[in-house]
């Protein structure tokens, strides 16, 4: 099994080849740069959310999504979503993706999957669908 340092070295090599290895780290030329970018983007997003409030932030995201859909067209937008889903599946692993699907399958228009699982006593192990690092 690879040590943490070996794994970081491999991720750094991939980043230096132009691959994004940290979610939110797009544009960073090293692993450390991608981690730094992701942290900054996360903090910036939280600051903006605090400024706009929950509803305003949600609306801003919705408008951005609609704009992107117009730019890419329906098929391009669908392809982008598919690629994102595949990336997320790789990050979580098969077991995590399965567990996330179980939770999503419990959701209804009136109740989230998490709420329903709690109400019905269904165990959903959310630690399985955290990004593997």
Curated annotation (Swiss-Prot):
Sequence repeat start-end pairs: 24-43, 44-63, 64-83
GO cellular component: cytosol
GO biological process, one term: response to abscisic acid
Ranges in coiled-coil conformation: none
Stimuli inducing this protein: By abscisic acid (ABA) and osmotic stress.
Biased composition (Basic and acidic residues): 7-19, 32-102, 113-133
Entry keyword set: Repeat, Stress response
3 X 20 AA tandem repeats: annotated span: 24-83
Region of interest (Disordered), residue spans: 1-133
Pfam families associated with the record: LEA_5 (PF00477)
UniProt similarity note: Belongs to the small hydrophilic plant seed protein family.
Function statement: Lea proteins are late embryonic proteins abundant in higher plant seed embryos.
Protein name: Late embryogenesis abundant protein B19.3
Organism annotation: Hordeum vulgare (Barley)
